[in-house]
Amino acid sequence: MMQQQSIFTDALNEQGKHQPSRRTFMWALLKNWWFVLPLFLICWLPVWILTTLYIDDVERDFKQTTDAVGELQASVLRLNLKRNISTADILAGFVEINQGDVNGFEQNAEILYRSIGGISALQLAKDAKISHIFPLKGHEAAMGHDLLHDDLRRKEAYIAISSGKITVAGPFNLKQGGYALIARRPVFIPDYHSQIMQYPNFWGFANVLIMFDKVLEDGGLDTLTAQGFDYELWRFHPDTGQPQSLAGQAGLRENPLSSFEIQLPNALWYLAVQPRFAALSTSQEVAITTLNLLVRHC
């Protein structure tokens, strides 16, 4: 019995002598790198290429989806702003046709106010001083406001006069309370003797007041949030030239997936959009992990 165990042990020891160790195996691979490397590349390279192409395709689709959603909301915002701002042209036309006679302002302003949603108030500013407001309730504090002698309003008011076109001021805090945009259309009437010597035919302004929360509501920006996207509406401040966040997640503009321009008559706004969800779904991540495992065990 003892002799049989000895023979068995000797056989195992003899077999162990002939079995290569892990270190010996690795050394053999290194010595034969010219054979191992091509084999490794044959296994790894196709999988790496397929994985890269797959990820690129997913990210491209992800970017296209974000672009489509963001552009839709940017278009809605543009159209609503354009509609509301252009109301100042209609109001100015009423003054010009009547040669500065503003009798009937309230009746005409009420029609505009009720037919074009999103407007908070319509104003006339004869000689650049607010003289008529509809609706007056809630806006009484703005009556008599001298735009050309207000440090916060003067610059954009003079831009409107000198250009002869609609300008958009704000958003800023109002004297009567609230945060709003104001579209100003300068009105010029032949033979009118203006108080501003360099603009002798300048009658005043036709103004449209648009509350900023209404701009955001009508622009449907809350839809972006509901669909899983973060956004930032921003501009370069006309006085400082520095970026100013108007709404949304401040700082998102630094590295958004998509960005869109909102052109106003005398300003440019930007809408930055970034999805909150990952580019790759759980199933896609599983697929990529599987490919990686195949590479490792090839």
What is each of the regions a protein language model found here?
Residues 1-9:
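N-terminal acidic, proline/glycine-rich, low-complexity intrinsically disordered segments
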Residues 8-56, 60, 134, 289-297:
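Extreme N-terminal signal-anchor transmembrane helix of membrane signaling/transducer proteins, especially
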Residues 8-21, 258-278:
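Juxtamembrane amphipathic/hinge helix adjacent to a transmembrane helix
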Residues 20, 24-35, 66-82, 215-218:
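Short N-terminal secondary-structure initiator segments
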Residues 29, 219, 274-295:
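Membrane-interface helix-start motif
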Residues 29-33, 58, 76, 152, ...:
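Non-transmembrane, amphipathic alpha-helical segments
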Residues 39-100:
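Juxtamembrane extracytoplasmic/periplasmic/luminal helical "stalk" adjacent to the first N-terminal
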Residues 63, 67, 71, 96-270:
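Intrinsically disordered, low-complexity polar/acidic regions
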